[in-house]
A protein has these predicted regions:
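Short, well-structured beta-strand-loop connectors
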Residues: 59-73, 84, 89-92
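Short, conserved secondary-structure segments in the cores of folded domains
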Residues: 53-54, 60, 78-81, 105
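Short, conserved beta-turn/loop elements at beta-strand boundaries and strand-helix junctions
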Residues: 32-35, 93-99, 124
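Short glycine-rich, polar/acidic loop-and-turn segments at beta strand-coil junctions
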Residues: 43-45, 77, 86, 125
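Acidic, low-complexity mobile loops and tails
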Residues: 2-66, 111-121, 129-133, 137-149
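Short, charged beta-turn/beta-strand-edge "cap" motif at the junction between a beta-strand
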Residues: 69-71, 76-78, 96-97, 121
Length: 149
């Protein structure tokens, strides 16, 4: 992971976004590792949705298309169907989340990752994803709108 972290402060909250990752509009981060994409909830998404009580990625070997459910995450606020930001085959899941789902909140970009997928189409995988700066701007607009409610 890079040492460059972009930060966004809104009201009493501080959100962090590593600049070496890509982000979907739904708040899922992607780390490209060769032909594999590791994914998880962004710091903004995990803080916004509350403490994670349960996290279950699809099984290894499952094929998912971009936008299809790749994991289910239950928080104290809401049950989330996590859409895959890339299409591919699940090659690894974070088994630690079965025992310690709070890792999603404690270390969203490290030990709290959800799944790794073997990418089916590398060129298409990056389409529609945002850089950290682009996602920070989107998160800022969403967070400020929520504070005003």
């Amino acid at each position: 992971m890079t040492d460059t972290i972009m930060e966004l402060a809104v009201d009493k909250f501080l959100f962090r976004f590593p600049s070496d990752l890509y982000y979907s509009e739904s708040g899922i981060w992607v780390r490209f590792e060769g032909a594999t994409a590791r994914i998880g909830l962004s710091d903004y998404a995990q803080q916004r949705n509350g403490d994670v009580a349960f996290a279950e990625p699809k099984e290894v070997g499952a094929r998912v298309r971009m936008g299809e459910e790749v994991a289910v995450v239950e928080t104290i606020k809401v049950n989330l169907s996590i859409p895959s930001p890339v299409g591919g085959r699940v090659v690894e899941i974070n088994g630690d989340l079965l025992r310690s789902p709070e890792l999603v909140n404690q270390d969203p970009y490290g030990r709290g990752w959800l799944a790794a997928l073997e990418i089916e189409n590398d060129a298409a995988a990056r389409l529609g994803l945002k850089t950290a700066a682009e996602y920070l701007a989107l998160a800022k607009a969403q967070a400020e709108a929520e504070v005003l409610r």
